[in-house]
Amino acid sequence: MEAGATLGSGGDVVDISTERTMGLIGSILALAGIIPRVGGLLSLIGFVLILIALHGIGNKLNDGRPFNYYLKAIIAIFVALIVGVVVIAAAFVVSSGSTSSIENEFIMSPGSEITIIEEESPHLTGEGIALLVIGAGIILAGIIVGGYFQKKAWESMYKLTGVEAFQNTAKFLWWGVLTIVILIGAILLLISEIYQIIAFANLPEKLTKRPETHLKPPIDDFEW
């Protein structure tokens, strides 16, 4: 279905050109997160711009689902990262008193023996390893939950606008999240980011406003 199919369908036409531009710039900045050093800051700015764009589009089209889903995704990922990093840091704290050393023995002359300690390195205890695994699991779980909500956000945008690239964004993002532990996951996420840029670039500047609805969201929307 083409994006223009939502125009002239018997409703008020609204201008979303500003939101389109913000979403496009935000998506480009989010992709720039792969740049060393400044990537994190650029991604953060990009996510904020995308949130603002989705909020504006939702208000103008009487549908807040894209914004709500995307906001939940950001919260889930952020909280999981904070908690996961704290747990991983605790793993090294509880293991800080445990060290291992490498020893070499040399016989210099008959009857004499010299032991040289080459290095001493931190050693994770059983508790430390357990905390390390738990922390990594929390981060991975947050990424999956966040990916689910992002998928729902882009699927909602596809239903609202008819821009098929949003549907492709959701599809590649979800499979990328599920395979994030292997290389193909990163490739799929990159493809998803590219489709996201294409989606906002193809988004028309004007869309037909939908009538307000007070229907209760379906249960599978995974709301909290």
State where each predicted segment sits.
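Low-complexity, acidic polar-rich segments
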Residues: 102-123
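Membrane-interface extramembranous regions at the lipid-water interface
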Residues: 2-33, 42-81, 116-126, 142-180, ...
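Functional transmembrane-helix hotspots
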Residues: 85-109, 201
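Alpha-helical transmembrane segments
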Residues: 128-140
